[in-house]
From Swiss-Prot:
InterPro entries: PQQ_b-propeller_rpt, PQQ_rpt_dom, Quinoprotein_ADH-like_sf, WD40/YVTN_repeat-like_dom_sf. This is Uncharacterized protein RP232. SMART domains: PQQ. Signal peptide: none annotated. Pfam families: PQQ_2 (PF13360).
Length: 415
């Protein structure tokens, strides 16, 4: 018995003896290559992006509970109403003024099942909903009455989008893009790539750009499809990147976070350790740089800001891809053993004194606030504890800032 026990413990004994024991085990923060500054260029947080009226005390405001269970998608704000989708496939309409759920409707026949993915589109007084199943369901936004539903060929994990007044687009996990009539849900056109087999990667919500819709597949493809008939305008594949080979159906061939775009360009972080800039009209690569494990990106002022798993925030020149600013997002006192965490997309806030700052929120309840002065963006942020598990933020139609966890919604002051 003792011999058997010794044999079972042998691998652990060897590990502890060869310098690979607990003191040397590295996590994703240690393993992610760090970015370094490459150019000394100014950073402007100017007004070509949304500027949010923000101070940290907003996060102490009243909390609303608009969902019956844990939310799995970003809330939708229409007037006084908040529409939410929860893990049990309940869609709820919550009145802010009355501080209560006005109606709630369960989308699934399996009420005890948990769902992930999907989202809500509000379009022409209706709610188009996907919830991590094969169904697209349409409800009347005012009453919650089900109008129509359609079963698609496979599971849908991203929210529907409107291509125009009469066309809704959905995308399945098996790389099928389907355009549907917004009234009848009849298929108008579809496009299909190789079915994904193995992937845990981020799924990009399609982007409508001029007469095209930009879609990505987990086979490592980015395509521009004509919104009227689904014709392929251009097709870019990650296998075209010059020093890597992307393997279809594996995460190295996929995107890591929400891409960002302006009127002419698309920026995509890939599992190949590449950040690429594509021309939206042609699909051609304008530049590519080495940048591993990117969590989030944002075009702000004259910079492309990225956050990676090394707990760094960096500012890049969007024209060249060169790094002009890097700062650490460290909170723990023992910086030698930083834990991995999730960061939201950076945003610019302006306080009551009209002072602008760059802000980064982590889901573990830390705000990193970078001030800017005549010398540029400061390297060392103010670090402030806030509520945990903030997943979304943005502006409502009345320009009120909101923050949302998976349970609560908090509102800031108006502009």
């Amino acid at each position: 018995m003792k011999k058997k026990l010794a044999l079972l413990l042998l691998p652990f004994i060897l590990i502890s003896c060869n310098g690979l024991g607990s003191k040397s085990v590295k996590n994703i923060v240690d393993l992610t290559p760090k970015l370094v500054i490459q150019t000394n260029e100014p950073i402007y947080l100017d007004s070509n992006t949304k500027i949010y009226p923000f101070n940290v005390n907003m996060l102490k405001n009243k909390q609303y509970s608009p969902a019956k269970s844990k939310m799995i998608a970003e809330p939708v704000f229409i007037g006084d109403m908040i529409y939410t989708l929860d893990i049990r496939a309940n869609i709820s309409a919550f009145s802010i003024e009355k501080n209560k759920i006005i109606w709630s409707y369960n989308l699934s026949k399996h009420k005890k099942d948990n769902y992930i993915g999907g989202g809500i589109l509000h379009h022409n007084g209706k709610l188009y909903i996907t919830y991590g199943a094969r169904l697209l369901i349409v409800l009347d936004a005012k009453s919650g009455y089900e109008i129509i539903r359609k079963e698609l060929p496979d599971i849908i994990r991203i929210k529907p989008i409107a291509l125009n007044d009469h066309t809704i687009l959905v995308q399945t996990i098996s790389n099928q893009t389907i355009a549907l009539d917004s009234e009848t849900l009849k298929t108008l056109w579809d496009h299909e790539s190789i079915a994904e087999i193995l992937s845990t990667s981020y799924s990009m919500i399609p982007i409508v750009q001029h007469d095209n819709v930009i879609v990505t597949y987990n086979t490592g493809q980015v395509l521009a499809l004509n919104i009227k008939n689904g014709e392929v305008k251009w097709n870019f594949e990650f296998t075209n990147l010059n020093d890597h080979t992307a393997i279809p159906n594996f995460d190295t061939s996929s995107i890591l976070c929400t891409p960002v775009h302006d009127s002419m360009n698309l920026y995509i972080a890939t599992g190949l350790g590449k950040l690429i800039k594509l021309n939206l009209l042609t699909g051609s690569v304008l530049w590519q740089i080495n940048a591993d494990d990117i969590q989030s990106m944002s075009l702000i002022g004259n910079s492309l800001f990225i956050i990676n798993n090394a707990r760094q925030i960096a500012a890049l020149n969007p024209e060249t891809g060169k790094v002009k600013f890097v700062a650490d997002l460290n909170y723990e006192k023992n910086d030698k053993r930083l834990k991995s965490t999730t960061f939201l997309v950076p945003f610019v806030g302006v306080d009551n004194n009209n002072q602008r700052s760059l802000n980064v929120i982590s889901v573990d309840g830390i705000l990193y606030n970078f001030n800017i002065d005549s010398n540029g963006l400061k390297m060392n942020p103010h670090i402030i504890k806030i509520i945990k598990n903030i997943r979304y933020y943005g502006l409502r139609s009345n320009n009120t800032l909101y923050f949302s966890t998976d349970r609560q919604v908090i509102f800031g002051s108006q502009i």
